[in-house]
Design a protein with these regions (language model features):
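Catalytic nucleophile-loop/oxyanion-hole region of alpha/beta-hydrolase
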Residues: 14, 41-71
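Gly/Ala-rich beta-loop-alpha elbow adjacent to hydrolase catalytic centers
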Residues: 77-82, 86
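The alpha/beta-hydrolase serine catalytic core
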Residues: 84, 95-221
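Aromatic pocket-lining residues of Rossmann-like dinucleotide-binding sites
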Residues: 26, 89-90
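Glycine-rich His-Gly loop
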Residues: 6-10, 80, 168
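Short, surface-exposed "cap/lid" segments of acyl-processing enzymes
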Residues: 1-39
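Short beta-to-alpha linker loops that shape the active-site pocket of alpha/beta-hydrolase fold enzymes
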Residues: 37-44, 105, 197-198
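Short coil/turn segments at beta-strand junctions that form active-site/ligand-binding loops
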Residues: 1-2, 70-73, 97, 161-162
Length: 221
């Protein structure tokens, strides 16, 4: 069997359009797909397990769950900080065979400043399929402290599995030049530089389809 684990970006729901789109197409391609609610944040609203370290444990647990089925392929596909986590997990977990990193940040040095005086940071996210509704999450500084323990730029230096890095050239959240830092350190990555697309391509079905078509090309290699 072939397994694909989909990793949302910062505070993103696993039920956002892009992940649902990827799920449907990957299922058609014969993958068993799970869209992970990282740290169970959307399920519980509790940020206690919302750290990269817990995300890695969660990914490890899901891979172990399928071990008896002897998957010949395990793909980690993440967007934004989910892409960051996918690379870190892929570099550490032997069973992972491919990584798809969409708009991954090289670090969160600038974003960390949004946690004023190292307190909690409150953010609002739209509810899937209900754009007029929202949920609010308060993330403690412990998230930043944990995140800073990981370096994706260092991780890719010793990463020799197939790696796709997707760069949205109109991205203003994770500027292309930041993601290019990862590309420079990586070993022969499959790089897609998509013009006229921003970080939140999830809000457009057409853009989601474009991204999925690029993912499909990579998986077929």
């Amino acid at each position: 069997m072939k397994l694909a684990l989909l990793l949302p970006g910062y505070l993103d729901s696993p039920d956002y359009l892009h992940l649902v789109t990827f799920d449907k197409r990957l299922t058609q391609l014969g993958y068993t797909v799970e869209r992970l609610d990282l740290g169970d944040l959307w399920k519980t609203g509790d940020p206690a397990k919302y750290t990269v370290s817990h995300f890695l444990d969660q990914i490890r647990e899901r891979i172990a769950y399928y071990k008896s089925q002897k998957p010949e392929e395990i793909v980690l596909l993440g967007h934004s900080r989910g892409a960051f986590t996918a690379i870190i997990a892929g570099s550490r977990l032997a069973g992972v065979t491919r990584v798809v990193a969409l708009c991954p940040p090289a670090d969160i040095t600038q974003s960390a400043k949004k946690w004023i005086n190292q307190g909690s940071r409150t953010s609002t996210k739209d509810v899937p399929d209900k754009p007029s509704e929202s949920r609010t999450f308060s993330i403690p500084y412990a998230y930043v402290q944990d995140f800073l323990n990981y370096s994706v730029v260092e991780a890719v230096k010793t990463f020799h599995k197939p790696l796709m890095i997707f760069i949205a050239l109109s991205d203003r959240v994770v500027p292309p030049e930041h993601t290019e830092q990862i590309v420079k350190s990586a070993n022969n990555p499959h790089v897609v530089r998509q013009p006229n697309m921003g970080h939140d391509f999830r809000k457009s079905q057409a853009d989601c389809d474009i991204v999925m078509s690029e993912i499909e090309k990579f998986l077929a290699q």
